Amino acid sequence: MIRKAFVMQVNPDAHEEYQRRHNHIWPELEAVLKAHGAHHYAIYLDKERHLLFATVEIESEARWEAVASTEVCQRWWKYMREVMPSNPDNSPLSAELKEVFYLA
């Protein structure tokens, strides 16, 4: 498995809405993530800085990257753009983090 971590932002007035939407994640999006080899996906919120920290284990970079082109992912990004900063293609603004330590 490949471990990934990245940060995103959530709008200061949208913390609760972001959480609500993820409490009711679409089953078809969950299915696409799993079908593309995503495991142990977690997102954490830093309320003071409006930051989201995400971790996920993936089976391959190619399969992970392919999620973005699925119809359900495109719809989810469009749905989420009002609660978080997004790119012109509606994908969330994000920055991948480099792993500097891991204890198995």
Curated annotation (Swiss-Prot):
The GO biological-process annotations, alphabetized, read as:
rhamnose catabolic process
Source organism per UniProt: Klebsiella pneumoniae subsp. pneumoniae (strain ATCC 700721 / MGH 78578)
Nuclease recorded as keyword: no
Q: Which GO terms describe its cellular component?
A: cytoplasm
Q: Give the protein's biological function.
A: Involved in the anomeric conversion of L-rhamnose.
Query: How is the subunit organization of this protein annotated in UniProt?
Result: Homodimer.
Alphabetic keyword roster: Carbohydrate metabolism, Cytoplasm, Isomerase, Rhamnose metabolism
What does the record give as the active site?
22
Catalytic activity as recorded in UniProt: alpha-L-rhamnose = beta-L-rhamnose
Protein name from the UniProt record: L-rhamnose mutarotase
* Gene that specifies this protein: rhaM
